[in-house]
Amino acid sequence: DIAHRGRLPVPLSYFGAGTGRWTASKGSAINMQNLKRGSFLRNSIMAPQGHVLVAGDLSQIEPRVLAVLSDNEALLDVFRAGGDPYAAFGAQMFNIPGMNKDSHPVERQSAKSALLGAGYQLGWASFAAQLLTGFLGAAPLRYTIKDAKTLGVTAADVDRFLSWEDNIKRMESIPHTCTNKELAIHCLAAKAIIDRYRAASQPVVAFWNLCQELIEYSLYKGKEYTHKCITFRKEQIILPSGMAMRYPDLRPDKGDGGKVVWTYADGNKRVSLYGGKVTNNIVQGTARCVMTDGMLRVAKKYPLVGTVHDELIAVVPEEEAEDAKTWVFAQMVAPVPYLPGIPLKTDVGYNRRYGLAKG
């Protein structure tokens, strides 16, 4: 009984996700990923007497990995300069020079959502729908006429948008409580953001296209192909760790309008596969390798007691806290031999309470 013994086991499934990430164990009543920052539950998790919890989080690891794999030098320059990629994209997107997290928090959050989702070929309808429910844990957001005008959307654009049957069908699939006109404005603003991302991120678009071609060339036909640290083979993609992401029984099927769509078996269901999804899988899998390498280095000195997303948690003697913070930082941003030149960044902090470890 946890209440009596005091220790909290954190049940994780190794390679629980298809990309290799850890997941909460099936049947577990504890999922650390669901503990919100500042919550009482998060703050109730404590290090043993005389110790602290050191938490280190790899910042924006997925956009950094994607930038390297796609040779997106413009984004890499932002990272190398220590800049804020979300604010930089937001400034470009909304034409607000010098914007930052404090001056324009809503616009920056929109840019963050776009950068994280659009990088994996997210379409405007999915982006619009996810914004309405809260993209990646952010507060729900619906773009207004003011936002649309800032993005260059005109009344004529709205009328033209509503005259296309395909757009109406996509809109009807989006759960909403606003009027159809308001939803159309929101969708057009979302589309403008997606379009601007793609126009400004041609290396990423080219990488999607490469991954799309490799679905047939390598994953289906079995012709081996290596791109940087990733190797494509018959129904599998080999990560830098040597582990494989698998796509069993991959085959072409007919989609809407006779278009060829690729699907693979996932248990009893078929799952679609396309360039953007392959990109997502590769980036998440490679980011997991970078994270795991850092964890293995840290574990040589301090015991790890958990990992949440791109964060590790170690137990450290209280008197070593400051030195441990510096040391953990160094282990997490150490050079990555299979991603030469990737500019890593990490935030590290400590406290006896987990919820206060990073401020």
Language-model segments: residues:
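Acidic, glycine-rich two-metal-ion catalytic cores of nucleic acid-processing enzymes
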Residues: 1-101, 203-311, 325-332
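Short, solvent-exposed polar/charged micro-motifs at secondary-structure junctions
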Residues: 21-22, 63-64, 315-317, 353-359
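Catalytic palm active-site di-aspartate
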Residues: 57-58, 124-130, 139, 147-148, ...
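Core structural elements
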Residues: 89, 110-126, 240, 317
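Alpha-helical scaffolds flanking conserved acidic
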Residues: 103-114, 302-303
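Extended, well-ordered alpha-helical scaffold/bundle regions in very large, multi-domain proteins
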Residues: 117-214
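Polymerase palm active-site segment centered on the conserved acidic dipeptide of motif C
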Residues: 189-213, 319-359
